[in-house]
Amino acid sequence: MKYVEGFVENIIFRNEDNGYTVFNIVYDDEEITCVGVLSYINTGEFITAQGEFVKHAVYYMQFKVTSYEFRAPDDAASVRRYLSSGAIKGIGEKMAERIVKTFGDDTFRIMEEEPERLAEIKGISMSKAMDIANQLIDKKDIRKAMMFLQRYGIQMNLANKIFKRYGNDIYNILEQNPYRLADDIEGVGFRTADEIASRAGIKIDSEFRIKSGIFYVLNQATMQGHTYLPYDKLVRQVNELLLIDVQDYDKYLMDLTMDKKIVVKVKDNIKCVYARMYYNMEANVAAMLNNLDVQIEEDQKFIDDRIARIEDKEGITLDDIQKEAVAKAVRNGLVIVTGGPGTGKTTTINTIIKYFELEGLEIRLAAPTGRAAKRMTEACGYEAQTIHRMLEISGGVPDGDRKSAAAGLSMFFERNEDNPLEADVIIVDEMSMVDISIMNSLLKAVSIGTKLILVGDVDQLPSVGPGNVLKDIIESGCFPVVKLERIFRQAAQSEIIINAHKINRGEEVVLNKYSKDFLFVHRNGADNIINAMKTLIKDKLPDYVGADVYDLQILTPSRKSNVGVERLNKIMQDFLNPADAIKQERQVGDVTFREGDKVMQIKNDYQLTWEKRSRYGIPTEQGTGAFNGDTGVIERISTFDENVTVKFEDGRFVTYEFSQLDELELAYAITVHKSQGSEYPAVIIPMSQGPRMLMNRNILYTAVTRARKCVCLVGEEEIFRLMAGNVSESKRYSSLADRIEEIRYIEDFGQ
């Protein structure tokens, strides 16, 4: 580490949101450009900064500050310089000269300790003297806080967030319960808070640490798709996290229950522990679904005649199950339509749309992702939106608490129970990937009396987010469900569809490289598999399916294996978008982002702003929100502005500060989970050994059904057979079905 010191000559740039500052300091006539998160420095101040010199591509050498200390002015010249800088509102150059002339080297002490004496100077009233004193106190408090936080090893960008949140309460919080940071501050998890607590001398068996650990494990479980954990599993994971043998868990669970942070329920003699937010979501969703489940009387002959009229006009023929789906949509407020590829879901939904159009009803279509919404629009000839956009997402976050935003709560949508959607019928496709938080937000915006039709393939992978919404709704047995199973003639010509159903039913699939749309390229060993994939994605498949290279997608079950996402992305980046002197880059950890890279948003960020642009680059539409699974291409990396601009597939341009790049990852290869709701002209799937829990039928089925024109499996046939035969799946702990059944029981028995 190196040190530089001097007077802050001028602030060149400051991002008021994150505190990133570019400034010059001067000492002994030498000027040094410094950069870092220093929200609270001002021109005229004398600082000692710690950091390293870095070479900027445009602006040559800069000093990257990691920590700093302020030195109070200690002579007349430095006081004059500080006061003349404008750091203290109400003091200009002339006033600064008068103050220093009166008090000399003792000026700064008098301003801090005897501020009333400033009123001795012409032009300064007693109230102005007190205002100057208060400004100095505020600045001193900030500097003291920054130094205090740095002693705990807290980096300046995080120190900035902590001080903004707590102000002068930071001393009590860090010395008594640093684990509050994990609850309140975005970017602080349990592990960061635990490290700070260790430096603060908090005991490893502190009740604050144990309760924070319990809550952390529950929240981590939601990242794995769970809405609760069984007691024994929770205890085991908390003990592993804390590295202590915690006694009397029931006491801590009771405390957390009293604090309204968790809920404990007993199911089949098993104690189930929920983060309260997710328990409430499941309970709310169950209640709202129940409210929508109303029956409407309608003459069967009238329904049959209208369906026949639509069939005749559209030149289609529905089978009996499809007609049943239409009739149930007419007669019920809530209907679920499920089925695999080629079973006529689109034809059924189109008929339902035509039916309600004849009724003159207002219809809204939605899907979880931009890709899925685009597909729905193309298939139905009726505009579909993402669920987020239909609900009119808002970038505002109550009280600046972005931690809550990550949960996807309905408070971040303009459409809610107080401002419901204006629609008579709402149809939502790709329901298998809708998690409990989005379902909660959606249902809040649906009025009683509005028909809700949920469509999806229950055999697909469940949502990335917590819950198992579609499966739980169906398994509750409480709502009308229609399962489409017949494969129609046109679909029966597609080996993708035929083989997908064979995989799902556990039937034998014939593999060869001569199929027109379901190819198997035999290769042994990860390197040989990857080389074959390179040839396919660049030289063979684009012309074969008539698509751009970036429209094709490599899907792989895992992240860490020899053919996992991380390794494949590095290899495919170098192959498809190699480094070039004219391409700007940005390194983030082990990943290099490069102009021209294919990237994916990997978390929901409700505050990111976006714009759409005309062909001339003029903004034509603006909004907020970028969502998990959105894919695009890096258009520009600016080392001067320290940001990256991505153009997403739907035409949105989003600019990320360098500090936000953890929200992106390369997307030449993505996990099968991340592909949910998407469809690609062709998919390439490596068949190589990976983690057994991911080598299952559900993953394979989901992967092959992502392809529209061609599936290309590359690797070892025995791996394909292993996956197709492995029906075990990772247990997902969710209880929406239980909550639905509870409500029905109460309705039926009044208890």
List the predicted regions and their residue ranges:
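Structural detector for short beta-strands of small beta-barrel domains
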Residues: 1-15, 51, 631-635
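Short aromatic-glycine-enriched beta-strand elements
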Residues: 14-25, 640-645
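Accessory alpha-helical DNA-binding modules that contact the DNA backbone or grooves
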Residues: 20-28, 33-34, 42-52, 57-271, ...
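Pre-P-loop entry segment of helicase/translocase ATPase cores
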Residues: 150, 219-220, 264-324, 396-397
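Conserved RecA-like ASCE P-loop NTPase motor core of nucleic-acid helicases/translocases
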Residues: 335-377, 455, 518-525, 540-561
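Conserved helicase motor core of SF1/SF2 NTP-dependent helicases
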Residues: 355, 359-361, 370-374, 379, ...
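Conserved helicase motor core of P-loop NTPases
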Residues: 458-624
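C-terminal accessory regions
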Residues: 505, 621-623, 628-751
